[in-house]
Design a protein with these regions (language model features):
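Conserved beta-strand position repeated across blades of beta-propeller domains
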Residues: 44, 82, 126-127, 171
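A short helix->beta-strand "capping" segment at the edge of beta-propeller domains
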Residues: 24-38, 68
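Beta-strand-rich domains and repeat architectures in extracellular enzymes and scaffolds
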Residues: 32-61, 79-80
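A flexible loop/linker signature enriched in serine peptidases of the S9 family
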Residues: 53-59, 73-78, 93-103, 111, ...
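Short coil/turn segments that connect the beta-strands within blades of beta-propeller domains
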Residues: 47-48, 86-88, 131-133, 175-177
Length: 212
């Protein structure tokens, strides 16, 4: 059984993945709980909740399964929903304005806001730097749509480029270690097992170190 879009909860107690068309949630004792049928993508886990995309909207469901709640009602392409570290907000990429932009929702109030107005051909939410800043990847400051850089956008819409160079994904551990994935030449169907010069690379910087 193959798996795609794997995401591990921050407390390491659970992870979600999509084997073919049926998404499962696995807890650390190995129990697999089927969530629902349908074309579901991009799961992310926080505590006892899983967020995912389906039917051109963002949905929320308990880790234990049950009725999923639709968080958006826009019926446009969405991808990469990500919980904030404290679990109170979710950021995602939405094509509501024809171009991919960063949106955020407050789970307590249901308030949904658009954070970026960049107009780039590609722009994908990566995660959160902290509870106030969303990390995303975008080529909006280059003339090459395939050359994306990593940015943060604050909850009031202020965008800053991170100093890691070109990148499409980022992970920062609690002790400050950093992993950056450089842009690749296309989707995985084109670069799977590819070892040429345009293959993506993973750069690692240990905690308290200055160089990758």
């Amino acid at each position: 059984m193959s798996a795609r879009f794997c995401k591990i909860a921050m407390d390491l107690r659970a992870f979600a993945y999509l084997p073919s068309r049926l998404p499962f949630v696995s807890v650390t004792d190995g129990t697999l709980t089927p969530m629902a049928t349908g074309y579901l993508r991009y799961p992310d886990v926080h505590g006892d909740l899983v967020v995912f995309t389906a039917d051109d909207d963002v949905w929320l469901v308990p880790v234990t399964g049950g009725r999923a709640s639709r968080l958006t009602n826009d019926h446009v392409m969405v991808r990469n929903p990500r919980f904030s570290p404290n679990g109170t907000k979710i950021a995602w990429t939405s094509y509501l304005g024809q171009r991919p932009e960063v949106f955020v929702i407050d789970l307590a109030t249901g308030d949904q806001r658009r954070l970026t107005w960049l107009g780039a051909a590609r722009s994908f939410v990566v995660g959160w730097q902290d509870d106030e800043h969303v990390v995303f990847s975008s080529p909006h400051q280059t003339n090459d749509v395939g050359l994306a850089w990593l940015y943060t956008v604050s909850l009031d819409g202020h965008v800053e480029r991170l100093g890691y160079g070109p990148g499409m994904d980022l992970a920062v551990s609690s002790d400050g270690a950093v992993a950056v994935v450089t842009p690749n030449s296309g989707d995985c169907s084109r670069w799977k097992r590819y070892r040429g010069g345009t293959a993506a690379q993973i750069w690692l910087r240990p905690a308290r170190a200055e160089k990758f």
